[in-house]
């Protein structure tokens, strides 16, 4: 029959035909997707529920003028299964994948909340940083040359060649926000700040280096879009979703993106409400280091993991990259194509513009920061300097 786009009616038909519900079951279906690239349907017959996700052959945020390969759905399904191999407690269950229709049937996580929405609403997720730190350590270690035999790693790397979505990252994260491109989207009040950003040659040179790292460093399987909208949470659970951008890339990329989105939420808050975000930033890194170190000692397959002096070098390189990638994410989420509700939903215009200027300033400082001895306190320090006026855009 070939590919066709599902509707709420045909999604129910599909689910019944594939045995998820009885033929006579009264199944309620709603399209619940709020993302940029896919349809997401929730189906419920009162006794059980499932999620059907379908990749569209174009970017929903733009329309059919921006075509995309539906093969990204297969990459997403495979990534979730790889993640589940190492940390099943942190991802939804994949029930099935239909490559022809680009349909994946997965566990319904309605018991949880989208982490971005919860953080905006002031919800507390005390285990978020522990879970994400451990998730990242396991996935990055076990899919790299450190924890995977080189032959297996090369085969796996080939499975996650993801040109369409990597191109989106290359453009929307590393290129477009740093120059005059039609994809950019920002308030006129930011123009002077942006002009200064775009004329900063030192900044652009650093961004070029981070983009080149993304293009060339195939160190481990990365989620590729690990922001707080790609995570479901409750006080006791954390589930990482939507790895359709998954590819082989730098160790520090996902860490930087996650931290950047916590910083964006911190910028939307009053000073006395920011502490929990820095708790999560710092604990994410400490749990990552703790878990990565244990895996290095106990599970390393690369011969040089026996050299104790190499581990701190690897960890410092990961941290340095995470700092720069976080800076790029801050800037692109502020003036690029895909914004975040943390900033855009600040109701007072003056406060919103000020927060966005601070995001641009902080992003610039993180990208340009150079020190081989920095630690996780760097994010708190530069943030405080930025919001206090010590750093100007």
Curated annotation (Swiss-Prot):
Q: Does the keyword ATP-binding belong to this entry? A: yes
**GO BP term, example:** L-methionine salvage from methylthioadenosine
- Ubl conjugation listed as a keyword: no
| Pathway(s) it belongs to | Amino-acid biosynthesis; L-methionine biosynthesis via salvage pathway; S-methyl-5-thio-alpha-D-ribose 1-phosphate from S-methyl-5'-thioadenosine (hydrolase route): step 2/2
Q: What's its EC?
A: 2.7.1.100
State the Gene Ontology terms under molecular function: ATP binding; S-methyl-5-thioribose kinase activity
Q: Which InterPro entries match?
A: Aminoglycoside_PTrfase, Kinase-like_dom_sf, Methylthioribose_kinase
Q: Please list the reactions this protein catalyses.
A: 5-(methylsulfanyl)-D-ribose + ATP = 5-(methylsulfanyl)-alpha-D-ribose 1-phosphate + ADP + H(+)
Say which enzyme class the record assigns: transferase
Residues binding substrate: 225, 332
Which UniProt keywords are given for this protein, alphabetically ordered? Answer: Amino-acid biosynthesis, ATP-binding, Kinase, Methionine biosynthesis, Nucleotide-binding, Transferase
In terms of SUPFAM superfamilies, this protein maps to: Protein kinase-like (PK-like) (SSF56112)
Q: Which domain of life is it from?
A: Bacteria
Entry binding sites for ATP: 38, 53, 107-109, 242-244
Q: Which Pfam families match?
A: APH (PF01636)
- Quaternary assembly: Homodimer.
NCBIfam families per record: MTRK
Instruction: Outline what the protein does.
Output: Catalyzes the phosphorylation of methylthioribose into methylthioribose-1-phosphate.
Q: What is this protein called?
A: Methylthioribose kinase
Which organism was this protein described from?
Bacillus cereus (strain ZK / E33L)
Upper taxonomic lineage: Bacteria, Bacillati, Bacillota, Bacilli, Bacillales
